[in-house]
Amino acid sequence: MYPESTTGSPARLSLRQTGSPGMIYSTRYGSPKRQLQFYRNLGKSGLRVSCLGLGTWVTFGGQITDEMAEQLMTLAYDNGINLFDTAEVYAAGKAEVVLGNIIKKKGWRRSSLVITTKIFWGGKAETERGLSRKHIIEGLKASLERLQLEYVDVVFANRPDPNTPMEETVRAMTHVINQGMAMYWGTSRWSSMEIMEAYSVARQFNLIPPICEQAEYHMFQREKVEVQLPELFHKIGVGAMTWSPLACGIVSGKYDSGIPPYSRASLKGYQWLKDKILSEEGRRQQAKLKELQAIAERLGCTLPQLAIAWCLRNEGVSSVLLGASSADQLMENIGAIQVLPKLSSSIIHEIDSILGNKPYSKKDYRS
């Protein structure tokens, strides 16, 4: 795992105490007298991000109204969350429009925000997707127009592109950073080998390497974030920004009796999620969640709070991206920070015993 207190570690944490009007927990979850919020370094970069970020996939420009999106962003910002993530492909660009409109309307200082977007699928034309120099530059320009921003803090390559030479992609990312369109760049859903290749190309040609990988991470998907990325962090300083802590809602427990109406699995285009939930493996996962629910009750928290705190307990995770469709849901998820100190080694061991899927690095062969 990652070091606990080295200077370059994403485990470096600080607490912010503010007098902002939005309390970090609603009365339902027990509001503390003072607002506390963790910040971590994004990989070995100097960029400080809140350990919880707000994502816009499915929700912004789609599942929720623009008014609800504004309410969620305001709640997040008032509670110390500074990281907001989107992508050119989310709701065919509308998610970026909604996000940009809210930032403009609220008048928040741009320097207080960390805005990230992802480039790969921009349009239907052959030249409007992928990681060519052309699409990275044109795609990011279009994203910035929709966001009404001069720059994003991190631009992510939303998939690896086997049709584009790695050197071309790394040169294009370096170019948009040098042009002031982005501060940093990262990867999403890339393999360790691909990230390492990008780093090697950057070092060979004196270009800018990626600082972060966006990866799926939850109780049922652990290998990449717990085994592969720690090695990359130690070798080249790439951090982890994780998404789907509730496995698209599976870990929330709402699918234990089937597919509720208006849930994500009931939406058009999410048949894959419905199939996953109703599969034999899905039923096994629901049985494990019932056991985890007992641990959550013992700790005085909800199952989603336990699941998010479990992701945060990994010191290699710089930030966990949350998805929310209601204010109550977001406040409940933010409440996971209160659960984090309760996750003792014995509790973690108990959770691992229930899950039965703890991955081991090749370096652990003696243990």
UniProtKB/Swiss-Prot annotation:
Top-rank taxon: Eukaryota
Residues with N6-acetyllysine modification: 124
Quaternary data: Homotetramer. Interaction with tetrameric potassium channel alpha subunits gives rise to a heterooctamer. Identified in potassium channel complexes containing KCNA1, KCNA2, KCNA4, KCNA5, KCNA6, KCNAB1, KCNAB2 and KCND3. Interacts (in unphosphorylated form) with MAPRE1. Forms a ternary complex with SQSTM1 and PRKCZ.
GO biological process entries: regulation of potassium ion transmembrane transport; regulation of protein localization to cell surface
Keyword set includes 4Fe-4S: no
Residue positions where Phosphoserine is found in the record: 9, 14, 20, 31, 112
One function term, GO molecular function aspect: transmembrane transporter binding
Record family assignment: Belongs to the shaker potassium channel beta subunit family.
InterPro entries on file: K_chnl_volt-dep_bsu_KCNAB, K_chnl_volt-dep_bsu_KCNAB-rel, K_chnl_volt-dep_bsu_KCNAB2, NADP_OxRdtase_dom, NADP_OxRdtase_dom_sf
Protein name (record): Voltage-gated potassium channel subunit beta-2
This protein's UniProt keywords: Acetylation, Cell membrane, Cell projection, Cytoplasm, Cytoskeleton, Ion transport, Membrane, Methylation, NADP, Oxidoreductase, Phosphoprotein, Potassium, Potassium transport, Synapse, Synaptosome, Transport
Catalytic site: 90
Function of the protein: Regulatory subunit of the voltage-gated potassium (Kv) Shaker channels composed of pore-forming and potassium-conducting alpha subunits and of regulatory beta subunits. The beta-2/KCNAB2 cytoplasmic subunit promotes potassium channel closure via a mechanism that does not involve physical obstruction of the channel pore. Promotes the inactivation of Kv1.4/KCNA4 and Kv1.5/KCNA5 alpha subunit-containing channels.
Modified residues (Omega-N-methylarginine): 28
Gene: KCNAB2
Top-level EC class as recorded in UniProt: oxidoreductase
Compartments, record wording: Cytoplasm; Membrane; Cell membrane; Cell projection, Axon
Modified residues (Asymmetric dimethylarginine): 28
Summary of the tissues where the protein is detected: Detected in the juxtaparanodal region of nodes of Ranvier in myelinated nerve fibers in the spinal cord (at protein level).
Catalytically driven reaction(s): hydroxyacetone + NADP(+) = methylglyoxal + NADPH + H(+); (E)-4-oxonon-2-en-1-ol + NADP(+) = (E)-4-oxonon-2-enal + NADPH + H(+)
Post-translational modification note: Phosphorylated by PRKCZ; may be regulated by incorporation in a complex composed of PRKCZ and SQSTM1.
Comment field on protein domains: In contrast to KCNAB1, the shorter N-terminal domain of KCNAB2 cannot mediate closure of delayed rectifier potassium channels by physically obstructing the pore.
Stored Gene3D superfamilies: NADP-dependent oxidoreductase domain
NCBIfam families per record: Kv_beta (TIGR01293)
EC numbers: 1.1.1.-
List of residues binding NADP(+): 56-57, 63, 85, 158, 188-189, 214, 243-248, 254, 262, 264, 323, 325, 329, 332-333
